[in-house]
């Protein structure tokens, strides 16, 4: 976006990785507030219903990163994302919960004119109508990436999508309990499909992750949580 690092301000978060509304930095019309629907380690959701109206009142733009968590809106856990619809823009991935091939991300913008103005690639030799699809993305031409997403949604249907997400959330909770019983530390509340895990020592954590990855049967994603190694399980 062209911002220098001195323009970035990190908001204070609580123990679950959610922005703390009481410690939100001051905002104005130049502010772009980035919120999360599904924190990458814990699966937690920012307090949209409280944070977004405050940002709007200050004239800020609110963007929600919902790479996997935005799909909770289609499940029995929709309450986790209460207020997310108040934002100005959203992003999500199809290759995560929809199981489509990689390169199936999507961006949604409330203000179509603002999006078209930012992405416009018209030239003297290539003009287009106001609603031309080429003016909604950085790429002048691209393949039909949306077909895989359409096929997944058409195949699952609303009920199938809800059942799949509900099942994965339920399985994440079951996995967390099994890991606790096996002597591992589960570091998050498993409200969604993420299970954040640590062994008794950093060495055990790293060894467990590397052994799982080497098995070729399962993938434990590496991460750092509160200054120490951990690994992520995403269902």
Regions found by a protein language model. Give the residues of each.
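Conserved PLP-enzyme active-site core in the AAT-like
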Residues: 1-116
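A glycine-rich phosphate-binding loop feature that marks nucleotide/adenosyl-phosphate handling sites
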Residues: 15, 71, 122-125, 188-196, ...
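Conserved PLP-binding active-site segment of the aspartate aminotransferase-like
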Residues: 34, 196-202, 217-235
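Anion (oxyanion) recognition and catalysis
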Residues: 56, 180, 213
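Active-site C-terminal subdomain of aminotransferase-like
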Residues: 82-182, 187
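Conserved alpha/beta core surface patches that mediate binding of polyanionic ligands
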Residues: 128-134, 212-219
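Conserved PLP-binding catalytic core of the aspartate aminotransferase-like
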Residues: 184-212
């Amino acid at each position: 976006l062209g911002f220098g690092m001195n323009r970035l301000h990190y908001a204070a978060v609580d123990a679950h990785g959610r922005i703390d509304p009481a410690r939100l930095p001051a905002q104005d019309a130049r502010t772009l507030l980035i919120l999360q629907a599904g924190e990458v380690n814990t699966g937690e959701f920012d307090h949209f219903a409280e944070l977004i109206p405050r940002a709007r009142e200050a004239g800020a733009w609110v963007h929600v990163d919902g790479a996997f968590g935005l799909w909770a809106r289609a499940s029995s856990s929709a309450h986790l994302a209460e207020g997310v619809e108040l934002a100005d823009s959203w992003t999500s991935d199809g290759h995560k919960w929809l199981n489509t091939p990689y390169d199936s991300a999507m961006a949604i913008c409330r203000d179509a004119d603002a999006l078209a103005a930012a992405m416009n690639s018209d030239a003297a030799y290539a003009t287009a109508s106001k609603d031309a699809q080429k003016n909604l993305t950085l790429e002048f031409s691209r393949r039909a990436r949306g077909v895989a997403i359409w096929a997944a949604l058409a195949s699952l249907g609303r009920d199938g999508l809800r059942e799949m997400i509900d099942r994965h959330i339920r399985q994440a909770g079951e996995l967390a309990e099994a890991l606790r019983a096996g002597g591992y530390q589960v570091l998050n509340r498993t409200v969604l499909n993420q299970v954040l895990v640590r062994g008794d020592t950093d060495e055990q954590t790293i060894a467990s992750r590397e052994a799982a990855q080497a098995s070729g049967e399962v993938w434990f994603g590496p991460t750092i949580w509160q200054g120490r190694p951990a690994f992520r399980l995403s269902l």
